[in-house]
C-alpha cells in the first residue's frame, strides 16, 4: 500500500511529528510512505526512516497556491497512491481540488485529520471533506459535528494522538544539576522582565507585561 501525506512544511510541531511517526510506522509495516510539503529541517529525519519526500510549494496562504492544483493532480497520476491524507488547510485545498477531478474508479481514497479547533468558515471546511475524517479527540469530533453539521457523522473516527515511549519514558527524572541550571535560567529571565517595569504600574499590568514578554520569548 502507498500512502501520501500532505502538509505545508516539515520544520517543527505536533502535526509534523505525527506525520513522521505515521510514515515511519508505515515503512516498518512494509508499506510505501510519501510526504508532500515545501520541505524543512525534518526532511532528513523523514528520509532516514525510509519514507520519501516530494518537495512542492503547498504552504503559501494565497490564491496563487491554486496554481499548484494541476501539478498536484499530475503527481497523483504519476505516483498512484492508495490513500491521500491531508493534514492542513492550504495543502488540503490543493489536494482536494486535484483529487475531486480524477476518475472516481482509480483515484486514491481521501482521508483528512482535524488537528484542532479551526476558525469556522468555508476555508476550514476542507478538513471535513475526506471520505474518512479523523478527529484527534472527542472534543474535536463534537466541534466537527456542531460547526460542520453537513459532515456525515459515520465517516468521523476518533484517533487519539499517540506518544512514543522511547522519547517520553514514564519514569524519567532529569538530573538535579540540569534542573538547577534550568530553574536558574528561568528565574533570571523572569527577574529581568520584572526589573524593567515602571514602579508605578499595578501588579496586574506587570503580570500582563510578563505574559506578553513570555510569548515574545517563545516566538524567538
Model-derived segments and spans:
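N-terminal strand-loop element at the rim of the active site
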Residues: 5-67, 155, 218
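A conserved, positively charged/aromatic
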Residues: 104-138, 150-151
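Short His-centered aromatic/hydrophobic patch
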Residues: 86-92, 114
Amino acid at each position: 500500500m502507498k500512502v501520501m501525506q500532505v502538509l505545508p512544511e516539515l520544520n517543527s510541531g505536533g502535526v509534523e511529528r505525527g506525520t513522521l511517526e505515521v510514515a515511519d510506522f508505515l515503512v516498518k509495516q512494509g508499506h510505501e510512505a510519501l510526504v508532500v510539503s515545501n520541505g524543512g529541517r525534518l526532511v532528513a529525519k523523514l528520509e532516514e526512516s525510509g519514507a520519501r519526500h516530494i518537495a512542492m510549494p503547498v504552504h503559501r496562504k494565497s490564491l496563487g497556491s491554486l496554481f499548484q492544483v494541476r501539478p498536484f493532480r499530475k503527481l497523483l497520476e504519476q505516483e498512484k497512491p492508495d490513500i491521500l491524507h491531508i493534514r492542513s488547510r492550504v495543502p488540503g485545498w490543493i489536494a482536494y481540488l486535484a483529487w475531486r477531478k480524477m476518475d472516481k474508479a482509480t483515484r486514491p481514497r481521501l482521508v483528512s485529520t482535524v488537528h484542532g479547533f479551526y476558525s469556522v468558515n468555508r476555508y476550514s471546511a476542507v478538513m471535513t471533506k475526506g471520505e474518512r475524517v479523523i478527529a484527534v479527540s472527542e472534543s474535536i469530533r463534537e466541534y466537527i459535528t456542531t460547526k460542520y453539521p453537513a459532515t456525515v457523522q459515520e465517516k468521523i473516527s476518533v484517533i487519539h494522538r499517540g506518544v512514543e515511549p522511547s522519547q517520553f519514558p514514564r519514569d524519567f527524572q532529569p538530573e538535579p544539576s540540569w534542573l538547577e541550571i534550568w530553574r536558574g535560567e528561568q528565574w533570571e529571565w523572569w527577574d529581568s522582565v520584572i526589573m524593567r517595569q515602571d514602579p508605578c504600574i499595578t501588579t496586574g499590568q506587570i503580570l500582563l507585561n510578563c505574559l506578553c514578554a513570555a510569548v515574545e520569548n517563545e516566538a524567538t
